[in-house]
A protein has these predicted regions:
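Detector for C-terminal structural segments
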Residues: 78-79, 346, 350-351, 355, ...
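Extracytoplasmic/peripheral linker and loop segments enriched in polar/acidic and small residues
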Residues: 210, 214-224, 233-280, 290, ...
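Gly/Pro-rich hinge or "lid" segments in bacterial periplasmic/extracellular proteins
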Residues: 89-95, 290-332, 338-341, 345-350, ...
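C-terminal motif of bacterial Sec signal peptides marking the signal peptidase cleavage site
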Residues: 21-24
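Append "and occasionally in soluble cytosolic enzymes with long acidic Gly/Pro-rich linkers
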Residues: 406, 414-416, 508-641, 732, ...
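Aromatic- and charge-enriched surface segment that lines or borders ligand/interaction sites
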Residues: 119-305, 444, 506-516
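N-terminal lobe/hinge region of extracytoplasmic solute-binding protein
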Residues: 58-128
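Extracellular/periplasmic solute-recognition and catalytic clefts
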Residues: 406-419, 432-500, 531, 535
Length: 785
């Protein structure tokens, strides 16, 4: 069960989640901030009645890294974004607000909302292809300890995240900011340099031969432990009759024989072809290293728990920075233009980069050393390569957000309203972020343990909610429920390299073959998804989350259901058809595609002959753990039965996650079902660009779409700043994806926020919640009764 880029993707997701959380700063229900600083005056009149209001929010176990730079879990991030301020705001669609200081109005779902932020951004695309992000910060931001914030606090934070020793989730260091790569790479960790140089390196400029020899000996010793950990994990988790049979053994035989355990571990992890008689854990590690040629990537991707380097007894000897050339004291493209302004100069335009411009406003005087900050002399609040002082404040956070971090004790984070917050002191005095189990969230709100939660949505959860309300509805006298579309969606994919005619994935015949399958599969979506999810999900028609600003809408010209025309472009369905008639019509339309692919049919409507080079059989992999419990399982089985009536065999293989994942990552799955979480920007590069197909790049284009026109549109879309233009470009790109017949959008499920109707003033929860505009988006106006 390869981890396969999961850690890299998780880091990107965490970073983006933090950006969007920091961007959620206010809306039209919040009046524009006054021009005067919100810091309290020296003399104030005591309120007539002390505000003692408290709200308890249910959350999962914290990683206890409450630092804007080093948080590691989404639950820590929820806390961090409550006391931290970000430079830019975002709207309900996840788009960046350019004019947050004065306020910017954006329509959503028929309502105009005005958004305020801590700063503005002006994007200037230069004639030479470079781009300037001119950032302006409000001049009245105050940290919760009373210290005014300036642009130097922002610059300090940028240099923390660009430091060669930085190991948090931000990827600012990867942006094409002028001089960034030179600054970041001017010092590198010795173990990374040794790993990159390889075993046969003969250049000993930065280390001696003895160091290199000792390093690789230590790697081999750790590698054997690394492989053994995988073996032990596989045996502990998958030694069942079903999986043991994959190596023609029984669970008892595997449990009793270490050699069989190695074979089983290699096979289940996708290394069955590398196994030889008598193979050991050391041989297994050698196979892993050979497969990657990069021990760092191998460690990140193949881990069963521990990093390779965690298992090196002498890793500390190599976990140190080494100067790789002349010192680079600053980043040329980070330009201070005033006490409250900054320009970021990038060598090229990337539409996704603007999300990184909502830099943390991090108090230099708290996380850094003011005596070590002098912008003009290339001093940025700490010694380059040493973030120990910043990390030391991980459990003592400070910021300029709506709340002040007070403590973490016994699984509870206590936060108090920040009177200096730029949108005004929050109405709820105290918020407790309380650890708990997801299954206990809704019952806990009913009993008074919690006031608000975001539980995983399931039939059991919805039943618990409706049972608690006297009206039997999701919102009633006990609980108030808000359903929001999930950021990702479920889909069915086809590997074009494996499902084609005569080895030509891009031919019209190959596209027709795949569209024949998709036409039959698509028609069963409404019935099956409604049966499986009910109100918890809806069928979608395009390969993009409905939450994206680039998603086609039903009112758009040319909008149509996925795979709803035949091979001649004629509509398959009409409004008078019932479900059975639609199924029959879809099957007949599929035949037109199969005929275009080269199939012939006899008088009884069954396949008479298949085209040369067509696969002999077809298979869909579904990770239902052998229990048929997957939202797309019913679609696949219904389509399989329908196709069987015309003589085409489509097998539905319900497998464990490891088998499914190995097939997907090894690009051996003809067809598969999956779901993913999308980002705020609809950039398609990672999933659909040919540079990531055929095992190249990130190996994330599992469809193996290799289309120059699609590649050009993807690049065009990510290099334009015009949102409407990008939307039209992505609409064309989605058309090509659908024409290749490699993806069937299936469903978009929903998330939910549940609050106590009794204790929370639910009228103060945000209106028109979205994945990018949740319950915390207007936390300063959220009130309890």
């Amino acid at each position: 069960m390869k981890m396969s880029n999961i850690k890299k993707i998780l880091a990107l997701v965490l970073a983006l989640v933090m950006v969007l959380a920091l961007c959620a700063c206010g809306n039209s229900s919040t009046p524009a901030p006054s021009e005067e600083t919100q810091a309290p005056a020296e003399e104030t009149q005591a309120p007539a009645e002390e505000n003692t209001s408290t709200l308890v929010y249910a959350t999962a176990t914290f990683g206890q890294k409450f630092s804007p730079f080093f948080y590691t879990t989404a639950y820590d991030e929820e806390v961090v974004s409550s006391f931290t301020g970000g430079l830019l705001a975002a709207d309900r669609g996840g788009a960046i607000i350019h004019h947050g200081i004065e306020g910017e109005t954006v329509e959503y779902n028929g309502t105009d909302y005005t958004y305020y932020g801590m700063g503005d951004v002006e994007v200037v695309q230069n004639d030479d292809g470079s781009v300037d992000y001119n950032l302006t910060m409000r001049d009245d931001i105050v940290f919760s300890d009373g210290t005014p914030a300036t642009i130097d606090d922002v610059i300090f934070g940028i240099y923390v995240m660009a430091d060669p020793s930085y190991d948090g989730s931000s990827t600012v260091y990867a942006l094409p900011i002028e001089g960034m790569a030179d600054y970041y790479n001017s010092q590198q960790y010795l173990y990374k340099l040794l790993a990159e140089a390889g075993r046969d390196n003969t250049d000993f400029t930065l280390w001696d031969e003895a160091t290199q020899t000792a390093f690789w000996a230590s790697v081999d010793a750790a590698g054997e432990k690394f492989a053994q950990e995988i073996i032990d994990s596989v045996v502990a988790s998958y030694n069942t009759d079903e999986y043991a049979a994959t190596i023609e053994a029984t669970p008892d035989e595997i449990a009793a024989d270490p050699a069989l355990q190695v074979k089983f571990g290699m096979n289940m992890w996708g290394y069955g072809d590398a196994w030889t008689e008598g193979a050991t854990a050391a041989d297994y590690w050698a196979a892993i290293e050979a497969a990657y040629g990069d021990i760092i990537e191998a460690s990140d991707t193949e881990t069963a728990g521990s990093s390779l380097f965690d298992l090196m007894d002498d890793f500390a000897d190599y976990d140190k920075l080494v100067a790789t050339g002349d010192d680079v004291p600053s980043i040329k493209g980070i330009i201070r233009t005033g006490d409250y302004s900054l320009t970021v100069h990038m060598t090229e335009y990337d539409a996704t980069a603007i999300y990184n411009m909502s830099f943390i406003i991090a108090p230099l005087h708290h996380y850094g050393d003011v005596s070590k900050y002098d912008y003009d002399n290339n001093k940025f609040g700490f010694d380059k390569g040493d973030l120990s002082g910043v990390k030391a404040k991980t459990t003592e956070p400070l910021g300029c957000g709506p709340y002040i971090f007070k403590s973490y004790e016994n699984g509870v984070v206590t936060m108090e309203a920040n009177p200096t917050y730029f949108l005004g002191e929050p109405k709820t005095k105290t918020i407790l972020f309380k650890e708990g189990e997801d299954a206990d969230y809704v019952p806990g709100i009913v009993t008074g343990t919690y006031d608000l939660a975001v539980p995983s949505i399931s039939e059991e959860t919805l039943n618990a909610i409706t049972d608690a309300n006297s009206n039997g509805e999701l919102t009633g006298d006990t609980l108030t429920t808000i359903l929001v579309d999930y950021r990702g969606y479920g889909y069915l994919g086809i590997n074009a390299d494996l499902v084609n005619i005569d080895g030509d994935p891009g031919s019209e015949e190959s596209k027709a073959l795949r569209k024949g399958f998709m036409t039959v599969l698509a028609v069963y979506r409404d019935t099956v998804i409604n049966s499986y999810y009910g109100d918890r999900a809806a069928v979608i028609q395009y390969p993009i989350s409905n939450t994206s600003w680039a998603a086609p809408q039903p009112a758009d010209e040319g909008y149509r259901a996925a795979y709803s025309v035949d091979a001649d472009g004629n509509d398959i369905f009409d409004s008078s058809m019932n479900d059975e008639q639609k199924y029959d019509a879809a099957l007949k339309a599929a035949v037109t595609f199969f005929e275009k692919a080269g199939y012939t049919f006899d008088a009884d409507g069954k396949v008479a002959s298949a085209p040369a080079g067509a696969p002999e059989s077809y298979e869909i992999l579904i990770p239902g753990q052998g229990k048929q419990d997957h939202p797309t399982y019913g679609i696949a089985t219904a389509a399989s039965k329908a196709l069987e009536t015309i003589g085409i065999k489509l097998s539905v293989n319900d497998v464990g996650t490891s088998v499914w994942n190995n097939a997907l990552e090894g690009n051996t799955a003809q067809m598969w079902v999956a779901a993913w979480q999308s980002t705020a920007d609809p950039d398609m590069y990672q999933v659909y660009h040919s540079s990531n197909a055929h095992g190249k790049g990130t190996n994330s284009n599992h469809y193996q779409v290799d289309d120059p026109a699609l590649d050009a549109l993807i690049i065009d879309g990510r290099t334009s700043a015009d949102t409407e233009y990008r939307k039209s470009v992505y609409k064309q790109a989605m058309g090509i994806i659908m024409d290749w017949g490699v993806e069937l959008p299936v469903y978009q499920r929903k998330d939910c926020t549940v609050a106590s109707t009794i204790r929370v003033d639910c009228d103060t929860l945000p209106k028109d919640m979205t994945p990018y505009w949740g319950w915390k988006a207007e936390i300063e106006t959220l009130a309890v009764k």
